[in-house]
């Protein structure tokens, strides 16, 4: 049976591993390195990947694509993409569908295409070692990747000629590698600060069971940001001394980036390093070449990136809160990602959790090792390992009044499936629009819309009668599909959220922060909408009953009900949920006599009820009103 490989598709470096017997093993590439730079370069006559691409980046900056993982599944309008445009020497353009693509040598490539080139390199590395063709893989992604980013990663695998059996979260993969041979029960935190993304996951491990309790993160925080702080500092110092802005020169900027990365790595073990870049520019007036010779201390580096390190601690606090555990209950902190080699990062993590992190895993390789273990589980080579991951954000749909009705809460174990019955909001409504949202706010408009679709040709019926079953399905890859079915006709419509849309990391951060800051306001707004929905529904049904059965009660009762209806109608114009609820109760009480008269009349017409007859049932039971969009004849054609 052909091997299933595990791939860590990283922002800065990528790594491939396989199961070798009972243990995972990292495979060296053709250059003899255990990790491969996630860089692709396009020259006049060839395409370079990995170290060869990195070596020529200075002389070919506009055609050398790096950190493309930060663009995968993103839109050109995303704030992160706008930020990236100013930082990278290559061109980021609109792919024609709103997605962020790259342009090199006049040709456009999607981030999935560029990522596929890196995956192909990983595939070839494994094939060279195994001596056989590889067609299946497990690929890792940041835990906080949204649906679009996961879809795009899967697409990249497909382009690379790989069947992606599973998309697995990076911290979860790291936990698998850490806990494979451990039999005791532990609660661990995986702190994963990589080249472009940050994740924190809290897991419980117990003799082969790996259960993720919560996850949080930032998909635009990583080593690339640390490098840019050094680059900006070096450029500013050079400008002060020579009056030349190196950031305007793409070749000089690429040299600075390489120097910054090298200095950052050196300062993890040394207290000072020298940055020496001869002939980096020239004096425009005299033509004299200018050189950069500068010392950078560890203390200076720490001051430049202090806020970035601190920014990683906020998601840590959120993850602990969501998991319902205290810092003291964390038995082990596992560090993952190259940036965790920085002494200051280790210090801050130690201070936050109150304990020294575990240093028994290689932060650059542990994610690929975990992916290989998951591949072994899927292939049947690894026994007695059960992995339970979670979805990072709540999912639901917009219902009447713009309310966000959750079907799946954040940190729900996946795979998962949840259904709920909704109905129409108008009489004879023949179509409903299902709008799918992701987020934590109570009102749909405050969350991120992932997609929408229409369920049409609903048979004419009074409002509240049709039963529309909406089903959310999240697979083990964290990819979402939504289905709506008219239970009366059996007609259904389905959508899998496509990679052309998705969330930015700022959107996710904003959703949770806003949800906490505005929880009370959201609650009040939701309470008002729900009160109005209840009031309008009661008003409609009572007036309809009065019209059809008003002759079954005396005139004073009819008058009392009409007065209560008018009072409720007036209260619905207000923004006071208490007033509306009071009017609802008054009308309910007033209409009680009418209800009794209707049932008595029905009972006398039907005669004595037999034991096997069903009692009266309301079609409104457990039904939530759904918002809809009038499609119009032309739109539906």
UniProtKB/Swiss-Prot annotation:
Any Pfam family: HSP70
Segments traversing the membrane: none
Domain of life: Bacteria
Bias-annotated ranges (Acidic residues): 621-631
GO molecular function: ATP binding; ATP-dependent protein folding chaperone; unfolded protein binding
Family designation: Belongs to the heat shock protein 70 family.
Protein name (database record): Chaperone protein DnaK
Organism of origin: Rhodobacter capsulatus (Rhodopseudomonas capsulata)
Underlying gene: dnaK
């Amino acid at each position: 049976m052909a091997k299933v490989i595990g791939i860590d598709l990283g922002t800065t470096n990528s790594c491939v591993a396989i199961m070798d017997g009972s243990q995972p093993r990292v495979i060296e590439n053709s250059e003899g390195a255990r990790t491969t730079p996630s860089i692709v370069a396009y020259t006049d006559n060839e395409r370079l990947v990995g170290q060869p691409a990195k070596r020529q980046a200075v002389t070919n900056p506009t055609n050398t694509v790096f950190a493309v993982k930060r663009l995968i599944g993103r839109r050109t309008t995303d704030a992160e993409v706008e930020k990236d445009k100013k930082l990278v020497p290559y061109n980021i353009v609109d792919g024609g569908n709103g997605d962020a693509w790259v342009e090199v040598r006049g040709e456009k490539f999607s981030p999935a295409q560029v990522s596929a080139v890196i995956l192909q390199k990983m595939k070839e590395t494994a094939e060279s070692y195994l001596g056989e063709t590889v067609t299946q893989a497990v690929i890792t992604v940041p835990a906080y990747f949204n649906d679009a980013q996961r879809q795009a990663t899967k697409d990249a695998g497909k382009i690379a000629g790989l069947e992606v059996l599973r998309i697995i979260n990076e911290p979860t993969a790291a936990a698998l590698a850490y806990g494979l041979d451990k039999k005791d029960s532990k609660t661990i935190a995986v702190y994963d600060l990589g080249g472009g993304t940050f994740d924190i996951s809290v897991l419980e491990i117990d003799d082969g069971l790996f259960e993720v309790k919560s996850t949080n993160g930032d998909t635009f925080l990583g080593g690339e940001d640390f490098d840019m702080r050094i680059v900006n500092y070096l450029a500013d110092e050079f400008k002060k001394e020579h009056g030349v802005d190196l950031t305007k020169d793409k070749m000089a900027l690429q040299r600075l980036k390489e120097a910054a990365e090298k200095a950052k790595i050196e300062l993890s073990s040394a207290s000072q390093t020298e940055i020496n870049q001869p002939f980096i520019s020239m004096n425009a007036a005299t033509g004299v070449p200018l050189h950069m010779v500068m010392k950078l201390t560890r203390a200076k580096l720490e001051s430049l990136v202090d806020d970035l390190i601190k920014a990683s601690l906020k998601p840590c606090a959120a993850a602990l809160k969501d998991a319902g555990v205290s810092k003291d209950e964390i038995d082990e902190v596992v560090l993952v990602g190259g940036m965790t080699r920085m002494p200051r990062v280790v210090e801050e993590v130690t201070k936050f959790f109150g304990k020294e992190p575990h240093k028994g895993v290689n932060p650059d390789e542990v994610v690929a090792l975990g992916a290989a273990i998951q591949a072994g589980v899927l292939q049947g080579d690894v026994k007695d390992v059960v992995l339970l991951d979670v979805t990072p954000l709540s999912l639901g749909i917009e219902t009447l009044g713009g309310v966000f009705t959750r079907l799946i809460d954040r940190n729900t174990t996946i795979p998962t499936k949840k259904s709920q019955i909704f109905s129409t909001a108008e009489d004879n409504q023949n179509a409903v629009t299902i709008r799918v949202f992701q987020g934590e706010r109570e009102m749909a408009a405050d969350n991120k819309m992932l997609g929408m679709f229409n369920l049409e040709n609903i048979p004419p019926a009074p409002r509240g009668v049709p039963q529309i079953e909406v089903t959310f399905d999240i697979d083990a890859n964290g990819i979402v599909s939504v289905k709506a079915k008219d239970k009366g006709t059996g007609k259904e419509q389905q959508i899998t959220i496509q990679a052309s849309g998705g969330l930015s990391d700022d959107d996710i951060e904003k959703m949770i922060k806003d949800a906490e800051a505005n929880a009370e306001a959201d609650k009040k707004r939701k309470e008002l909408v729900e009160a109005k929905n209840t009031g309008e529904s009661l008003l409609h049904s009572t007036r309809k009953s009065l019209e059809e059965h008003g002759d079954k009660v005396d005139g004073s009762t009819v008058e009392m009900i009409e007065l209560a209806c008018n009072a409720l109608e007036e209260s619905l114009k207000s923004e006071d949920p208490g007033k509306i609820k009071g009017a609802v109760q008054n009308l309910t009480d007033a209409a009680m006599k009418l209800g009794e008269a209707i049932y008595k009349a029905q009972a006398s017409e039907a005669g004595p009820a037999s034991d096997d007859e069903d009692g009266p049932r309301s079609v409104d039971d457990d039904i939530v009103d759904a918002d809809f969009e009038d499609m119009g004849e032309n739109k539906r054609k």
